[in-house]
């Protein structure tokens, strides 16, 4: 049974050829961009955010909220089958990593119970460099 996610057919054999060095460092090596430097951390543009590596639609602006953490924050993915979760114990912390379900690229982390006034009490803290934004058509 094959992967039925929209971006699954776009998996690159050599990510270094299709991604810029800063994109590769985060998407494929699990890095993190510096807070407050990414393209989308404070954008208010309405639309759909997709995986920069494979194009799978991951998040909508309707679920984006201001967390003031320096990275785009969402309270839910577009659909649960668009992301997968991975325990992350790097840096001496216990966190839950978020990856694109179609191409297995690292996106960021999800945090629970921080007290944000959102429907899920979750904060998907996603690196801007991992995303592209398709603005909503008027």
Would you name each region that the model predicts?
Residues 6-138:
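A short Gly-Trp-Pro
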């Amino acid at each position: 049974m094959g992967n039925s996610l929209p971006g699954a057919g776009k998996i690159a054999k050599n990510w270094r050829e299709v991604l810029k060095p800063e994109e590769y460092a985060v998407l494929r090596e699990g890095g993190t961009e510096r807070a407050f430097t990414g393209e989308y951390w404070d954008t208010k543009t309405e639309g759909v955010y997709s995986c920069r590596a494979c194009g799978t639609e991951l998040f909508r602006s309707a679920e984006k909220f201001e967390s003031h953490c320096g990275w785009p924050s969402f309270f839910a993915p577009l659909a649960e089958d668009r992301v997968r979760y991975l325990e992350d114990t790097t840096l001496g912390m216990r966190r839950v990593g978020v990856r694109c379900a179609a191409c297995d690229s690292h996106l960021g982390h999800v945090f629970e119970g921080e007290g944000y006034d959102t429907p899920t009490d979750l904060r998907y803290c996603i690196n801007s460099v991992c995303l592209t934004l398709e603005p909503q058509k008027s």
